[in-house]
């Protein structure tokens, strides 16, 4: 149950779990891991080796439109639109 929008870019060695939605122009850098129940917004960028921990049915982890996830980050909660998050666990550095 994966849904991909227009012009989505998925690089080498990425893993995409169940019930994932990727909206238009979203990008996964190499080595990204999306667990189940993840929603990636329009134009969102997920950096190399980042991990998005799974959400739950009816309450996915949402990476907002135009959000950026830094390389190697571990995302454990939803990220609002337009924000940049980095680190383990991921935290905002720019809104």
Label each residue range with its predicted role.
Residues 2-87, 91-93:
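Structural signal for interior beta-strand "rungs" in well-ordered beta-sheet cores
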